Amino acid sequence: MTTQKFGQIIDGVALSAKLRADVATRVLALKARGVTPGLAVILVGEDPASAVYVRNKVKACQDTGVRSVFEKYEATLSEADLLARIAALNADPSIHGILVQMPIPKHINPHKVIEAISVTKDVDGYATLSAGELMTGAPGFRPCTPYGCMKLIETTGIDLRGKHAVVIGRSNTVGKPMALLLLQANATVTVCHSATRDIGYHTRQADVIVAAVGKRNVLTADMVKPGAVVIDVGMNRNDEGKLCGDVDFAGVKEVAGFITPVPGGVGPMTITMLLVNTLEAAERTVK
């Protein structure tokens, strides 16, 4: 009989590096066939956090051989001009993925912008058609953060079939697609949110917990079944200004079988899965 180990760290940095190496190899194979995967990244305005995210995405492209086209516009850019630029990128065969960094200035409708991106180039997986493909199990693009979470869960060796998974959060970008991906893996899924009466009641029964609400300490040790897999999507700051997640890491790691840290867990995986989606978009053009 094996004894249960607690607090095993799921290393997102190591897994990300492994997956990026695989992307680089597949990019070389595509280039040998005359196709270089191309990702267009559009930044509108001066949001400092967005600028950092975009820099990281462009660097990740450079590191793996993906061609990145970075377009930066003033915050005064009109909605019509942005939509026209997206239409031009949709028609450009050298561009396989299009990403508009959010948030965008208030005079531009984000829904219109996301919907303007061709479903074949929607590597963020946010558009309504992409969400429909995910819902029906069609082979579309999976949103990068939930896709990365699934890869992290895979590393634990847990067979999700019949397991109880609880997702805390119901956002269109993480919570809802996360629940769908877990369903596709044959888990029994419960989604908790701000109107859930007793989140702990549900999480204490869970074999897998994904916390994705953007609120510190939403999951504490008393809410976790011993040996559970805990994935922390949150990105917050503690009282000392240090990065922390939605999970009380120090407490929960004493109970959980596996847990992702913040930073170094889900974060690195999000950009990696963006590269994977862009690569797959390019591969589809030569199949």
Curated annotation (Swiss-Prot):
Assembly and interaction partners: Homodimer.
Name of the protein in question: Bifunctional protein FolD
Keywords from the UniProt entry: Amino-acid biosynthesis, Histidine biosynthesis, Hydrolase, Methionine biosynthesis, Multifunctional enzyme, NADP, One-carbon metabolism, Oxidoreductase, Purine biosynthesis
InterPro entries in the record: Aminoacid_DH-like_N_sf (IPR046346), NAD(P)-bd_dom_sf (IPR036291), THF_DH/CycHdrlase (IPR000672), THF_DH/CycHdrlase_cat_dom (IPR020630), THF_DH/CycHdrlase_CS (IPR020867), THF_DH/CycHdrlase_NAD-bd_dom (IPR020631)
MF annotations from Gene Ontology: methenyltetrahydrofolate cyclohydrolase activity; methylenetetrahydrofolate dehydrogenase (NADP+) activity
Organism name: Albidiferax ferrireducens (strain ATCC BAA-621 / DSM 15236 / T118)
SUPFAM superfamilies in the record: Aminoacid dehydrogenase-like, N-terminal domain, NAD(P)-binding Rossmann-fold domains
Pfam families listed in its UniProt record: THF_DHG_CYH (PF00763), THF_DHG_CYH_C (PF02882)
